[in-house]
Design a protein with these regions (language model features):
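N-terminal cap/lid segment of alpha/beta-hydrolase-fold proteins
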Residues: 24-90
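Sec-dependent N-terminal signal peptides
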Residues: 4-13
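Short beta-strand element of the alpha/beta-hydrolase
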Residues: 91-101
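Cap/lid segment of the alpha/beta-hydrolase catalytic domain
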Residues: 101-114, 119-122, 128-154, 163, ...
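Primarily recognizes the serine-hydrolase "nucleophile elbow" in alpha/beta-hydrolase
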Residues: 151-218
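Boundary at the C-terminal end of the N-terminal hydrophobic targeting segment
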Residues: 17-21
Length: 218
């Protein structure tokens, strides 16, 4: 039962698609370099202010097999996340959102992501956005998925989880979701063989909700 609590929240509170327009003046090219995460620019937008930029150590891997044999440990990298929390000081559960092949610009232009975030925050759930692309030299991977192999979204999520477990506002409950490529990332995070490479035992995410993941994963 505990495992599905965050999934129920995610389904129930992400239905409002009114009132927000994707017509936001935001230059993704100028805000995305290996040394500059797009999330730094997004955090300054009027519609997205009030969160906390979090930098954490991660790794770049080629596929799931390379992680299982610790091959990813040869390629360390610093990743940026943007954490938005409900008002107040209460400890809260946190949902990780992973962007699609469109890159972290999803967090600005995608109405669904915006309203999902607002509804979760209103109902006492924090949201962490992660930029899997800019630090690895990509803004989007529509034309070439090999620019940033799929597994890296899952690696980043697990490394972020290790950091947020000790965040003063965290109640120790975590969920993960994402659309398309981000949904595929959620499937990776359901594999205990994978998650146990980062956290001992079976303790990973408490709830997982893939959205339009790859058919081969589903």
């Amino acid at each position: 039962m505990k495992k599905i609590i965050l999934v129920i929240f995610a389904i129930f509170f992400t239905t409002n698609l009114l009132a927000h327009s994707t017509n936001i003046d935001f230059n993704s090219k100028d805000n995305c370099t290996k040394r500059k995460s797009m999330l730094n620019g997004i955090a300054k937008l009027k519609t997205h202010k009030g969160g906390e930029i979090i930098k954490f150590n991660s790794y770049t891997g080629f596929d799931q097999r390379t992680v299982l044999i610790d091959g990813h440990l040869k390629n360390p990298i610093e990743i940026t996340g943007y954490l938005q929390l409900p008002k107040g000081n209460d400890k809260v559960p946190i949902v990780f959102y992973t962007h699609s092949s469109g890159g972290p610009g999803d967090y600005v232009w995608n109405d669904f992501v915006y309203h999902a975030t607002q509804n979760l925050l209103k109902n006492g759930i924090g949201v962490l956005f992660i930029d899997n692309f800019c630090p690895r030299g990509a803004r989007a991977t529509w034309r070439d998925q090999s620019k940033v192999p799929l597994i890296n979204g899952a690696i980043d999520a697990m490394m972020a989880l290790k950091v947020l477990q000790s965040h003063p506002r965290s109640n120790g409950k975590f969920g993960t979701t994402g659309h398309s490529r981000g949904g595929t990332n959620s499937f990776y995070l359901s594999d205990v063989k994978f998650t146990s490479k980062f956290i001992e035992g079976t303790k990973g995410f408490d709830a997982i909700l893939p959205e339009a993941a790859e058919c081969r994963m589903a």
